[in-house]
Regions:
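The structured alpha-helical core of multi-pass membrane proteins
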Residues: 1-646
């Protein structure tokens, strides 16, 4: 992974990558946004112009101003996204954890809704050519195929994403221009007065904001994927993308003005812009665009989970890297949970217009939480206080209005995304609280008090040698400390004699790509403590990293790793390395409060479905000893036990 990101360098390749990765979601919104706003209403000029004005100014205020101009300033060494932003400021205030968890879980919930909505909207265009064709099986087949290829990496097809999306946006613009030329009066809708009229004068107009919001649901991706493309490439490419989107929306508006006095019925404004001869091609391009949008969201979900793990928000599930390309991450458990969720959404709602009711509510919460975190970031960076208050006030009001308007969707399907978000958020809260409980209850001792005993044990030939090099994974952050459980394992559980003892600690930093280590020599050629400082986006391949540390130390003549058996030493045979990983369980002898006991029981239940710590750290299973140790809180006190004499 690179350690320096050229955020402000613009290149043709970068612009194309941005087109393919970032704008899939927001770029496919024209498929369903205006149809959702108009819905069953009678088409009339002020409704159409009000809808267009609302879309235009939402894109301007929400996407252009908030995300492209303001939020992209908050980069964590080139990386963006709600967890990257949280990592920048989490040490300043503990309460920031709550908005980070709400925003992250809502964003993951959105990953279950967006692919079905996007793909269904594209495939339903086939009904214009083949009215009797069943769309649900086709949508399920496409989504299943998409999730199946994740395990093999998407670097090959990924190279085509940019050009395909360039074709898509060009098509949006051309179709829009052709229709606008037939009804230029639609340009009046640039006037924000029409948006004001829609919200205040049109019956139930305020509640239409829930559908208007669909035009900007992909805005969060601009920030989340900043590390892939760079800030400058996003800002420059957005100019082109926004022009294409606005032209298409206004083209649809021009067509709607041509049918004023009617209702939409089964007609889809997006496809009505296409001449009949182009319809099959247009549907094909739309399908490819929605697949790309879904792919970007899946990849984003994998990245989000990997960050959540390192921030102690999520269980340590297995992560795989199918290719060396940056961003190519695969999380099997999340992949198939997303697949099951997407298929469930398709089977439950069947049509995209039904799915739209479940869409938007979750992502509104994410945007609100990003606003809170960003305001605190600006405050911590000593920006003008009035400017911070203005930013917070404007966007809390705007996004609060969108949230309230989206709440009307709750009984019609919005509950689905809320339920998914609550489940994900619940896991995050439980995992974080369990981590904090374990941290509070962990007992540490000073290493220097045991170095003499460790050296004596190492030379006690009456005890069988356990390993030449014995490596303990430790949670003790201080160089001078170690868990009491490690000392217990060395001396009491079964005395473990070794030539050299190693204590390895991994410290996850708020900087995404830190890769550093420090060695503390406790006793030359007897005991060492190695501390790795790894960024929250770095794969924790401790087996590989530890080998590198040993090589460096041998080269610098800091340690001799040759076996100390005389016959092997003469042959310069390297001694064996054995890792010990301590896995805790909740002992019955504890006095935890009921709430904390419940948290820990749920924590250990979930942990039973996750890989062991040794697999997470990439340790060779043949050289790992996993020891179960009780999470003993304190000895049970005041037991009245009477001894009987016979």
């Amino acid at each position: 992974m690179t350690t320096k990101h050229h955020l402000d360098t613009v290149s043709a390749a970068g612009l194309l990558v941005a087109m393919g990765i970032i704008y899939g979601d927001i770029g496919t919104s024209p498929l369903y946004t205006l149809r959702s706003i108009i819905d069953t209403h009678l088409v009339e000029p002020n409704l159409v112009k009000g809808a267009l004005a609302s879309v235009f100014w939402t894109l301007t205020l929400q996407t252009s101003v908030k995300y492209v101009i303001l939020i992209l300033r908050a980069d964590n060494r080139g990386e963006g996204g709600i967890f990257a932003l949280y990592a920048l400021i989490r040490r300043h205030a503990r309460w920031l954890t709550l908005p980070a968890i709400i925003g992250g879980s809502a964003l993951l919930a959105d990953g279950v809704i967006t692919p079905p909505v996007s793909v269904s909207s594209a495939i339903e265009g086939l009904t214009l050519v083949y009215p009797q064709i069943p769309t649900v099986p086709i949508v399920i087949a496409i989504l299943t195929g998409l999730f199946l290829i994740q395990a093999f990496g998407t670097s090959v097809v990924g190279t085509a994403f940019g050009p395909i999306m360039l074709v898509w946006f060009s098509m949006l613009a051309i179709l829009g221009i052709a229709q606008i030329s037939l009804n230029p009066a639609v340009v009046d809708a640039l006037n924000p007065y029409y948006a004001y009229w829609l919200l205040t004068q049109y019956p139930g107009g305020f509640w239409l904001l829930g559908s208007v919001f669909l035009c900007t649901t992909g805005a969060e991706a601009l920030y989340s994927d900043m590390g892939h493309c760079g800030r400058a490439n996003i800002r420059v490419s957005w100019i082109f993308v926004k022009i294409c989107l606005v032209l298409n929306y206004f083209g649809q508006g021009a067509w709607l003005l041509s049918i004023q006095g009617q209702r939409l019925g089964e007609r889809i404004p997006f496809y009505e812009l296409m001449p009949d001869w182009f319809l099959p091609t247009g549907i094909g391009i739309a399908t490819l665009a929605t697949i790309i949008a879904s792919q970007a969201l899946i990849t984003g979900s994998f990245t989000l989970i990997s960050e959540a793990i390192r921030l102690n928000f999520w269980p340590k599930v297995q992560l795989r890297y199918p290719s060396l390309q940056k961003g190519q991450l695969y999380v099997s458990s999340i992949n198939w949970l997303l697949w099951a969720g997407c298929i469930g959404v398709v089977l439950y709602f069947k049509e995209s217009k039904n799915m739209e009711a479940a869409y938007g509510l979750a992502i509104t919460l994410t945007m609100l939480m990003t606003t809170l975190l960003m305001a605190y970031y600006l405050y911590s960076k000593k920006y003008n206080s009035w400017g911070v208050v203005l930013f917070l006030g404007v966007y809390l009001a705007l996004e609060g209005a969108f949230l309230v308007a989206n709440l009307i969707k709750f009984p019609h399907g919005g509950w689905v995304s809320v339920l998914i978000g609550l489940l994900i958020g619940g896991v995050m809260v439980i995992w974080l609280q369990a981590f904090q409980i374990k941290l509070r209850l962990a007992e540490y001792v000073r290493l220097d008090q045991y170095i003499g005993a460790i050296k004596e044990l190492s030379r006690d030939i009456s005890i069988p040698k356990y390993a030449t090099h014995l490596v303990f994974m430790s949670n003790a952050g201080r160089q001078s400390e170690i868990e009491s459980k490690v000392i217990y394992s060395i001396f009491q559980k079964r005395p473990k004699r070794a030539d050299i003892y190693w204590f390895v600690h991994v410290d996850t930093t708020d900087d995404p790509y830190t890769m550093e280590y420090k060695v503390n020599t406790l006793a030359p050629d007897d005991a060492y403590k190695v501390t790795f400082r790894l960024g929250f986006r770095v794969e924790q391949r401790i087996n590989l990293f530890f080998r590198k540390v040993i090589e460096d130390m041998v080269r610098n003549k800091e340690v001799d790793i040759t076996s100390r058996y005389e016959s092997l030493s003469r042959q310069n045979v390297i001694g064996d390395f054995r890792f010990v990983v301590l896995e805790k369980f909740l002992s019955f002898e504890n006095e935890l409060p009921v709430y904390e006991r419940l948290i820990m029981n749920v924590y250990f239940f979930i942990k039973g479905f996750t890989p062991s710590e040794s697999r997470w750290f990439g340790l060779d299973s043949s050289s790992v000893k996993i020891e179960k140790v009780p999470l003993v809180i304190r000895s049970v006190e005041n037991i009245q036990l009477k001894r009987l004499t016979s």
